[in-house]
Amino acid sequence: VGIIFKSYESLKSIQAYARQSEESGFSGGFWIAEAYHWFRQYGLEARGCFTTLAAATMATRTIPIGLVITSPYMRHPTIQASECAAIDELSNGRFIMGIGVGKVGIEYLEYDTDKMKPVPVHHESMEIMRRIFSGRQFSYKGEFFESSMPPFDRATGGLRTEIPIYVGATGPFMQRLAGRESDGMLLAGLTSPAFVRYARDNMRKGAEQAGRTLPADFPVGGVILAACSKDGAKAKTATRSYTGTYIVNKLRNIKNDTILAGSGLPDSSWDPFRKAIADGTQDKVAHLVTDEMQRRFTVISG
């Protein structure tokens, strides 16, 4: 079990949360999800995800530090690799890199994901980053990215030559890519047991395609909204708006969504949210989130 925060929290708060997570024994890591400036509509200000990770790293000593996720559509793999290497050095080898499409973040950018298909984009990004981590000389020219670099002896300098890369995977093609090439798979918000089973099955198919045998403890992580309070009603309220935001996100950005289907709720349950999207009121949907939806998607103590 780990802890995840978005990078719209203040850096001092992030450091306090990271220390508390480490002291509480969360062995699954302290993770940062990249926030974007559209969170201002909720009164929140985005910070740079790597700077936020650095703040968490400086406040801790042993807990794994992870990024879940940043998008290869937003940063060239060479830039991603440089940022990874810096955080990994700062953390003494505790860093885990996570990459994923991040549709919410790139919807304001002029990327055509129908032409720049996510699977090859992420494949090429991992290829380049791993070659940079290795320190070996290389020249790479892919369909979307290219890079060439002279050698550098990272190992002698005490730097890791293999930094784990996890893939954020919502759909079956990205889940198969995770099985073929990644060091771990990250699932999106509103993860449910049924969706985990679905994703792991696709991941295994991808591994089989590559002739790869995944260990039983191959990392698979999912984002689960959680709130703790002595007052159960207050805990429900704390997660209700976020649950609504995630539901809208899935309906807007993912075709043939399997996350919502995995909840076991009928498809008609999401019709009020679809109407809100059509009406332009998708930012005010907390009241549409039922107790049953929260039971399927969240962990509430109180």
Residue ranges and their predicted role:
Residues 1-5, 28-32, 64-68, 95-99, ...:
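Hydrophobic faces of well-ordered beta-strands that scaffold small-molecule active sites
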Residues 1-12, 68-78, 159-170, 226-227, ...:
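Active-site mouth loops of central-metabolism enzymes
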Residues 19-23, 53-62, 84-94, 179, ...:
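Acidic (Asp/Glu)-rich catalytic clusters
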Residues 116-156, 196-302:
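An alpha-helical appendage that flanks or caps ligand/catalytic pockets
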Residues 166-168, 175-176, 181-185, 189-196:
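Ligand/cofactor pocket segment of small-molecule handling proteins
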